[in-house]
Design a protein with these regions (language model features):
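Transmembrane helical core of 7TM receptor-like proteins
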Residues: 1-301
């Protein structure tokens, strides 16, 4: 019974992620007033969320709810590639959003001259390029096509780098060297920058004389802090448990993987739809217009 319940829960979560992130993308792309650096970054994060969640949720739903409990080797490799690419670009996207908010709050008068849409496009493309390069290095180091596999079974809920390495009949430690260095560079490099950015933002907001501007700034800042916390918290918990010597069993590890994969992608569109005034206002306009259209058609009928 529990596989069906878990699969159904993942299906509902995946549906909400697609609905929320897709709504954000459509609203931002169709409203020229939202073609600003902040909203372009939100749109980029929504694309990452859809890609990141789709790479794992579709496999989990198929295995838990479907009759076929297998996945082809190349489908597994593709799923792993998309999953880790989404993870890396998501990390870099949060850094770009922290940079954007730091400039917007610390230098509001020069914001549009410091950050233009063209510069944001370049930064977004660069973040994807970095993700592709980092992932290419890790995959070249592992050389999955030439690994000897003991059995065609992955004891994880989806395909990722550790799962495929541990399924092979090799000592896994050397294969984690380069990916660990890359992960430390990303997490240890980006996370402190994000923390320092928000410390600077909070310091700037506390110095504002206008309470209304201060409240508006904190409102925006809290949205981003929640998103960052949901992204990094499961990863930090996993690292801390490993450092203090707590060994997770397979069920606990899979549960942490599911939370780390689905929670950020579910929270992000909810936060930006409910807390971002312009997106919320545009969404209300679309819904009220659709309701009015349906009402007119009913009256004519």
């Amino acid at each position: 019974c529990w596989p069906f319940l878990l699969g159904f829960l993942i299906f509902i979560t995946y549906f909400l992620v697609i609905l929320g992130s897709g709504t954000n993308i459509c609203i931002i792309l169709t409203d020229r007033r939202l073609h600003t650096p902040m909203y372009l970054l939100i749109c980029n994060l929504a694309v990452v969320d859809i890609m990141f969640t789709s790479s794992t949720s579709t496999t989990m739903i198929s295995v838990l709810l479907g009759e076929v409990k297998t996945i082809s080797y190349y489908s597994c490799i593709s799923s792993m590639y998309i999953y880790h690419l989404g993870d890396i670009t998501g990390c870099l996207a949060l850094s770009l959003m922290a940079l954007d908010r730091t400039i917007a709050i610390s230098n509001p008068l020069r914001y549009h001259s410091i950050l233009t849409n063209a510069q944001i496009f370049v930064l977004i493309i660069a973040s994807w390029f970095i993700g592709i390069i980092c992932l290419g290095i890790a995959l070249a180091w592992a050389d999955f096509d030439n690994l000897p596999y003991c059995q065609p079974i992955i004891r994880y809920v989806f395909c990722d780098y550790p799962a495929l390495i541990r399924a092979a009949c090799v000592n896994p430690e050397p294969y984690f060297l380069i990916p660990t260095i890359l992960a430390l560079w990303l997490l240890a490099g980006q996370f402190p920058l994000i923390i320092l950015s928000y410390v600077k933002i909070i310091y700037t907001l506390l110095r504002l004389p206008n309470s209304e501007s201060r409240a508006q700034g904190f409102n925006t800042c809290i949205c981003h802090i929640i998103v960052v916390s949901c992204y990094y918290a499961p990863k930090l918990v996993s690292v801390l448990l490993t450092r203090i010597g707590v060994r997770l069993n397979l069920t606990e590890r899979n549960a942490l993987l599911i939370i780390a994969t689905l929670l950020p992608s579910l929270i992000n569109p909810t936060i930006y739809c409910l807390k971002t005034k312009e997106i919320r206002k545009r969404l209300v306009q679309i819904l009220s217009r659709r309701k009015r259209t349906v009402s007119i058609k009913c009256q004519k009928g």
